[in-house]
Amino acid sequence: MRGIEGEQVLLRIILSESRTHDRAPLFRRLLELLRAEELAGATVLKGVAGFGHDRGIHTFMLEVTSEGLPIVLEVVDTQERIDRVLPKVDALMGDGGVVMTERAHVIRYAPSRPSITES
């Protein structure tokens, strides 16, 4: 495992859960890309509410299945690795969504405990 402690870059991608690429959720395609490019790791977060360029508020209600909720995909890695993957991310994103970077100070990067599997 390579260490990425210290000053790194946070890549944050915000998009609608309804976005697709080749009939698959776009966030899934982005996750597959980041894994294939061997970035340190990625996390996908689903928002409970948000609004975008259309100014309409999208929210999750138990009584109604909502579409277009915000998805946030976050990756922390070196500047070089983030810079290398950005053109590919941009190509997948097409129109819509937000892609941003910011500096991040990584205090700890360690593998999770082994998962407990049921027998």
Residue ranges and their predicted role:
Residues 1-119:
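Positively charged, small/polar-rich N-terminal and surface patches that mediate targeting and assembly
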